[in-house]
């Protein structure tokens, strides 16, 4: 329906519609190539209900991986850091380091930590990158299961603690 005419379109047979109806809550599809735009997207479908609570239908919108990448680029802590979004299957769907559409197995740090991140849902851990200690903080988005993480240099993450230590040491 790339001409804008959707009169012949029946969404009830589409997977996103069926999944939103079955889940009775917002659902996120896996990443796929949109037939019209040819861009990589994730669809978000949300059921809606009649006043009596019975299912009335579902609406769907696509999020391009480009848009998600722009949002990840804004994940910063005091202006520093790199962001990433990983889906529950281990597919990196957005990254400030150009890793979108790669699997966590291709990144040694993520490969070693991913199952723990899935299980714990949120937390942080330390790693070294390019000779600098980094803190990786992450949290799972409940509605999608996506893990959103940001890596920040340790010197930035703990700067206030370091200055507090100097203050107390000087007493």
Which sequence ranges carry the predicted segments?
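Extracellular/periplasmic ligand-sensing ectodomains of membrane signal-transduction proteins
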Residues: 1-41, 91-109
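Stable alpha-helical elements in mature extracytoplasmic
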Residues: 16, 68-71, 113
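Tryptophan-centric aromatic hotspots in well-structured domains and transmembrane helices
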Residues: 16-19, 28, 82, 144, ...
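Short N-terminal helix-loop-first-beta-strand/juxtamembrane motif that initiates sensory/input modules
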Residues: 22-28, 73-93, 118-126
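Extracellular/periplasmic juxtamembrane segments that couple receptor/chemosensory ectodomains to their
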Residues: 50-51, 88-89, 99-100, 104-167
């Amino acid at each position: 329906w790339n001409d804008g005419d959707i009169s012949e379109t029946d969404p009830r047979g589409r997977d996103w519609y069926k999944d939103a109806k079955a889940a009775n809550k917002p659902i996120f599809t896996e990443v796929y190539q949109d037939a019209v735009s040819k861009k990589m997207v994730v669809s978000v479908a949300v059921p809606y209900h009649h006043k009596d609570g019975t299912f009335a239908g579902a609406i769907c919108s696509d999020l391009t991986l480009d848009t998600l990448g722009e949002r990840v680029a804004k994940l910063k802590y005091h202006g520093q850091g790199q962001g990433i979004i990983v889906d529950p299957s281990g597919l990196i769907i957005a990254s400030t380091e150009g890793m979108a559409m790669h699997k966590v197995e291709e990144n040694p740090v993520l490969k070693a930590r991913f199952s723990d991140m899935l299980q714990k849902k949120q937390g942080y851990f330390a790693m070294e990158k390019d000779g600098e200690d980094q803190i990786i903080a992450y949290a799972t988005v409940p509605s999608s299961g996506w893990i959103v993480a940001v890596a920040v240099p340790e010197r930035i993450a703990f700067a206030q603690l370091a200055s507090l230590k100097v203050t107390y040491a000087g007493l």
